[in-house]
Structures are given as C-alpha cells and as structure tokens.
C-alpha cells in the first residue's frame, strides 16, 4: 500500500537480493561532507563486490591523525552520484544485524518488535525519550530553547514522576504520527508524509466506541474512491492496564476458509483470524471475497465482534482492457488498505491500536495478493487462459501472466476512479523523497529489500540506489498478535453474539458516526477586523460550524501561525485596511505567513529585505510561481511532495468596498498564500462588498463552506437546514436567554475603551481647534492640535494615522433611551448575562456574563461603545422584525432583511440611524439587552497625522473635514459626522482618547535626492503637511539639500477652502517645493478642465491643460 506494505501475513522478499548491497546495512564510511566520485570508484554493478584483502601478519600498526565523525556513504549506481547519510547518527536503536550476520531480509526481526505490555519502560528511559521527542517538536516549530519549550519539558518530567507516564498535546500527537510515517524505512510512499490526517481517539473508552471511530476512519479515508491517508490514534498503553487492540491485521480483509482437503477458499493469509471471528460469533459465508468482521478489544476485556456496514467497504471488480475473459474470473479487491496491527511509539509512549491507511501500489495487489503461492495464487490460471506454455519456466509464462494481472488491477482501479499508483511512479516519487530528505535532514532511513517493488526490479530507479537502514523515533513497530501474547488479559472467548446483537451494533455505530467525527474534527476560524464586522461574521461562522465540528474562533493576533502545520480545517474572515494592508490585528499573522516556506521554495524568498506588507500585497497579484503551483496541484498525483500545510483544508472570506482600488486584497493574499504553502482550498474565495449585499454574500459563502467541509470530512447534516437555523432571527436572539445584572463597579472611560477595542489607548489634550476655511464658506475644515504629554505610546512619524474614539451625540442617545422598554435605572451600572446551554460531560446550564462591554450604565454604553448612527444591517433588521408588534411593519422589516436589492436601495436613500428606523417602524419594542448584545461597536475614526514631530514636539495635528449632510436627496433629516462634529465642539483642555496606527509603507523616501510628487485634494493634503514640515526641518536643522518636491492640490475656491496656502508658499520659498500646482473646481469663470485630474499631467510633464495657480 502507499503507506506501508501489509505486514501481518505478507512477508517481504526472500534472501538473495544481490549480496545485500541495496540493504545498506554495511555501507562504506565517508566524511561528513559529500565528496565527488573518485575516478577509481567502481563503475560496474554491485553484483560481486571485491572481498577485503587480509592484513599482513606482521604489518606494523598504522598511525592516523584523529578523524572527525564518519557517516554512511551511499551511491546511486545508475547516475554515479554519492551522498552521505548524516541523519543515521541520530539512530536510537540497533538494527537486527550483527557484525557476523545480516538479518536485513527478516520480516519480523525481534529488535523491531514492541515491548510486551507487561514490561513498562523504566522511568529514566521514558524521560530520556520524552525529552528527545519534545526537543524534536519544538525544533520543528522553531521554538527550540524558548520559555514554552523549557516549561513543557518541566511539565512532562513532573507528570512522568507523578504518574509513570505523560500525555501528549494534540499538536504533539499530530507531529509524532507524521514523523513516524516519515521515519518508516520500509515504506515507499513517504513523500506524502506531510499530508497524513491524524484523528485523535484517545478519549475512547470501549470497543463499541472503537468501532465507531474506525467506521469514521474508513468513511473519511475512502472518500468515494479519492483515497486520503489517515491514522486514528486510540489510547496509549498505561502501566497496570491492558491495551486497546485491533486483532485484525487490516481493517478490511477477505476471509480464508480451510477446507476438508486442506485447501483454502478465500485468502489463505487470513485463515487464523477467520477462525477466531467464527469462534467469537461470526456467521461465515463461503465466498472467495467475504469481508471479515473486526475483533476489537478494550483494556482488560474480551474482544468483541463488529461487522462492517457494507456501504463503508468500497470494492473494485477486476477486468482487463483487452482480455475480455478476465472479468469472468470473478476477481475483486477492496479500495482501502488500512494496516491495524502495528504499534506507534512517540517519545517513549506506546499506542498499540493505531489503524492507518493510504492507497495501494498496484503491484501489492497484482503481484503479492493474487500471485504469491501462499495467497490467491491465480498465476497459472491466468496463464492457461492466455494460452501460455506453463510446462517450462523459460517461456516466461509467469512473467507474462503477472504483467497482465497488474495491467488489469491498474485498469480496473482507474476505471472505478479509485486511487492507485503504479510501481514505476511510486519508486520515482521515493527517489524524489530521498532527495528532499537529504536536503532537509541529511538522510533518510530506507530498507532496500522492501522499497524495491516485487515486479520490474532493476527497471525501477530504487534498485540502483544504495540505502541505509536505521531506526528513528517516533516509529511504527510490530507487536505480537494479541491472542498469542503470554499472560495477556481479557483474551478469552466470549459467547457468540446473535445476529440481532451484531446488527444492532452496526446500527448504533452508524448513528454515532457523525457525532463522534464532529467531536474529533476541529475547525479554527480566524478573523482580522478593523470595525468588528469580520469578528461578527466569524462568530456567526463558529455557531454554524458547531453543528458538525468542534470550532474555535480566534483573532489573528491571538493565533500562533506555527499551529497551521497541525491544523485540519481553517476558515479565515478578514477585512483589508488602507492600501491593501492587513487589518492591524492581522499584521503579525501576515508577517508570519510570509516567512513560512512553500513546497516549491523552501529557501527564503529573494525579496526578504522588502517590507512584508509590500511582499504580501504582491502575493495577491498574478505571481508566476503561484500560477505554476496551481497548475501543478491540478495535475498532481499521490506521488507529489506535500507542502508545509499538506493536511490543511481552508477557505477565506474577504470584506471590503469596491470603492477602493485594493478590494479584499488582504483576503486574496491569504487565500493565495495558504494554497501556495500546500493547503487544499475547499471553496473559492468569497468576497463581500459593503456597498452592495455584503451580508447576503457572506451567508451564501458560509453555507457553501459548511457544505464543502461536511462533505470533505464526512460529517454533519444538511447545510441549508443548518444555515437556516443559525441565520434565522428567531434563533439568533431570544429574550429569555438574556438578562441584566447590577454591577457595583462603575465605568472608567479609558480602561473601558481598552477593554472594548482590545488595544492600548491614551488620553491627549486639546490645545486648539481652528477652522481653516473662510467664514463665508458653508463648510468647515478644522485644524485640531493635540498635546500628547510626551507619552511614548503617542510617538509617530509623518504619514502615520491617529485613531480617535468619539462619543455619540447626547441628543441622539437621549432620544434612543426614550424608546427602550423597561430600561435599568439611569445611574446603575449593568452587565449582560447570557444563559449558556449545558453539554454532556461539560458544565451545567447557567448564566454567563457577556464580556463584550465593561460594566456601565445603559446611557454610557450608547454614548461611548455602541454604534447607533450607521444603518442597521440586514441581520439586525431581522431581529427587529421579531420585535415589531404591527404585522405590516414586521413584514416590511422581513422584506428589507431578505431582499438585498430592496435593502441597498433603502439604505442608500435613507442612510438611517437606529433612531430613524424606530421612527419608521414605531411598533418595535426595544429591550435593553438586545441593544447591548446586538448593536455593532462604535469604531475608532482614523485620520492622517498632519504634522511632524520634529517641527512640533509633543503635539499631534489633525486636518478634519466636519461632516454634515441631509439624506433622501437633501430632503431628509440632517446627519452629522460622529467624530468630526465632536472634535469641532471641543475646547482647550478637553480630553481625547486616541492611539497611533503606523503606516510604514507611506513615508518619504529615505534618499532625499529622489523626486517626490504629492497629490491630494481637499483634506487629502493632511499627511503631506507632515512631510513638508519634516523636509523643512531637515533643510534648516541638518543642512540637507534634498530634491525639491512637487505638490498637486485641489479644492473648490481659492478664497474659501485653499487649505494651508500660506504655509505652502512659505515652504516653497524655503526650498521644500519646486512646483505647486493647484486646481480650483468651482472657481468663477474657471475653465471646466481646472480639476485635479487636469493638474496631474503637468506634475509628470505630460500633455494636459495648464492648471498652475498664479
């Protein structure tokens, strides 16, 4: 099979394989570094290597200078290349061979078998192996020597001393299982080791649960013929307790019935297990291909018999592409090879029940299963049908018949669309794996006698490759059959189960499949958000996936990216900030994702010196490497190397606005990068435009993502029903599940804002607020000067942004409070509590405080923390429809919430605040807990810093357009900008909660001799004020002579809103600007072309209208 050959009853090749040179057990020694092939090296095949000459009897002792460590030297006799296996120095166990005997062809060497269950590993030995494994794990995630590494070592040591054993964390178990496959010397298909799906079944407590886990494993791995490698890990061996065991050598095997004449009908390799199944209650058939039931054993209990549901066992009837009579032979074989009798050792811990599966190499079926004399032995029957001369071996009838049987196997599996790989492709992939491992680890353990296939030996590249066989940990080991172990507990024969009992076990297992798989399949939902909307969507996604998975919802800055290598399913919901950048809480995730190595570029990227933001934005573009990788993935087979994220399935949803040029750029970059690193995309990137139907787009994508994930992991229920249940307003918010509790603690505003926005905040003080426009203007643009008080957290550079947390207007808050039913006392601090449902084995039902808001009065919540001015989302309208008492209003609200076109028209015409919605639908009864739990958070407003710290130490200047407008084509109510209006009303000494957000990609070039053109209409000039102040400071204080900059500015009228005209003219006179081009869009008697777009060509010396100001 693609992972391991079936080892229970299928011995390896016999002795006499060319003097054992290919076994690599006694290879030459060489220096640590590779050396070129010497001209004196033999070039003939290694069929008869010269024997070493005896040393002279009286030769004087040779004196040699001290040498460094030596490593096995391996040669490829086909191409002449030589390598040195340095990894072999880490071998932790002696091989079966001795200085006088080569035992490399033994199938079950004693040294490769696990310890008896009654012989626990001594504590010191266990500690040593545990330390070695923990060190391996932390080295793999690049955390070696970290505080977490040291704490984990201490934790493991304390656990071993206290209990005699220890427990692996899930990520450690996943790493250990993959490493065990990677280290398996006898497996030819290891290039796929990184794609092994690990199912953690260590919580299993009975044989019935074992059967349920196994059924789920088979269903997942079979995948309707598109086989996937998987392993299920049952509980580890524990001192003083019996083992979990699977008595069958493979999960799916055909019975072998011993006949009275001594012959066997069916598979002779399975006679013994067949008879055991009969003794334990199985009613046998009499066919050649009867699927055996499973004998499963829980600790200290007799084994129990379970029949596999027929729908789980995918079988392939065999036919030949040209020999029509072949189908009449009635041959068939099962799709899934799943070895189930081996022991997994990780860090000294032993797991005696670990069924693992991959896919078949065709020769395992065609040669071993059908042609071996001690198996089905059909070779002569096929030869007779082919009219071959079977009387003499020189006719090569065996070879001819064997080839046609293998052709039939490959043809039949491909016709049935069942994964299989031929021995030529498999061995070629192993050579690639050797090359990969030589680069990555300095070597690769390999057992030549098992790697070379049982057909076409020297026609495959592995035949000509010397190999070194050694044993690393973690590892798979053989173990004695459970019914043969001396002193094994609980192996007695139980009474025969009735057919009804067996059938009932199958029925119970089928009903538990989805539940158990859901408990095992974990989903990580990551969000990156500036406004909180992506977080809200991620939480909705978490509720949906809880229907069939075990999800957790995390902010990107809370997630350690190294965990991606051990994840099964990741869903990303993220917005994009500014010029295609990640949201601030996604910056660390983006940086770490860029530093991970992809499958086609294991070395660092050549552009590592660039800003990660610039590099990350480039990923979302049409990168030739990404295009090449996508094409390779589509054409790939199961012989390709997996990337760093080989076991990851993912899908991404992006939020943005098509009003900006970099729409969903960060989401597109994450989606591309995860695929580039080897992840498998379950669903195409979803995108939600805030200008039109964003929530509807998300709901459709979430449902499709849930459906795709359920199909991939063979779990769950109808996606439409689950999505309807989650997104239904009646199920989203229920009065009886929320209540207000009185809190003694009052609100402190700055700590409260820090709690809500999960970031550091600072208080700045107003120095002045000045209107920059003429008193004759109907609009206002203000210059706000803030005193930072020298706080380190408010240090900035020109080009950075400042985030300000404004309050809502008091009049709006008071009007909304008057609409709340049964509000708490005005001065009483409250918190929302939610009734959490209990779960089996978990905490009982109870009231849990909602942590979103700090304790505060309802008025404070509506003033400082909740957004009451933005148009309500469709989801909130659905909730309000359930609270409307008037049927017509209820119907209208439901229509608006469900019809994206109607909603967008209503939103853009009215742009209503929450209060205006309540005025339009007056029958809505508004409970206070709904406001506190369902309203979006009042988000910080970002402004470009409009000053330079060198020119104004301890100050931050802002250039802010004060927003005021009427909706409904100018006939609706007057709306005000939340932050701009508040800032315009502040007085000297007032406090402003704020923070700095850096913009490292928006800076003046470090080389002052480079030319700069600054283009900004209206308040777009704000950041450039900081640039010219910085440049002026450099000229006058540092004596720099920079290249003069060009400023292109646009406004309406030169006498009304020409911002900073005097400052600009002064800077130009001092050498900061070489040219200042100004366009006035509404200047009386001004030509129509005098807009900003007409001035830009002049800045680049391109043809265009002359818009220079006099």
From Swiss-Prot:
What switches on expression, per the entry, is described as: Repressed by hypoxemia in fetal brain.
Where along the chain is Zn(2+) bound? 97, 102
EC class, as a word, reads oxidoreductase
Sequence ranges of Low complexity compositional bias: 31-40
Gene Ontology cellular-component terms for this entry are:
caveola; cytoskeleton; Golgi apparatus
Cofactor binding notes: Binds 1 FAD. Binds 1 FMN.
Residues with Phosphothreonine modification = 498
Q: Which domain of life is it from?
A: Eukaryota
Q: Tell me, what's a Pfam family for it? A: NAD_binding_1
Task: Provide the protein's localization.
Answer: Membrane, Caveola; Cytoplasm, Cytoskeleton; Golgi apparatus; Cell membrane
The annotated regions of Pro residues compositional bias extend over: 47-69
* Example GO molecular function: metal ion binding
Task: Return the annotated region ranges for Interaction with NOSIP.
Answer: 101-489
What does it catalyze? Answer: 2 L-arginine + 3 NADPH + 4 O2 + H(+) = 2 L-citrulline + 2 nitric oxide + 3 NADP(+) + 4 H2O
Q: How does it assemble?
A: Homodimer. Interacts with NOSIP and NOSTRIN. Interacts with HSP90AB1. Forms a complex with ASL, ASS1 and SLC7A1; the complex regulates cell-autonomous L-arginine synthesis and citrulline recycling while channeling extracellular L-arginine to nitric oxide synthesis pathway.
UniProt protein name: Nitric oxide synthase 3
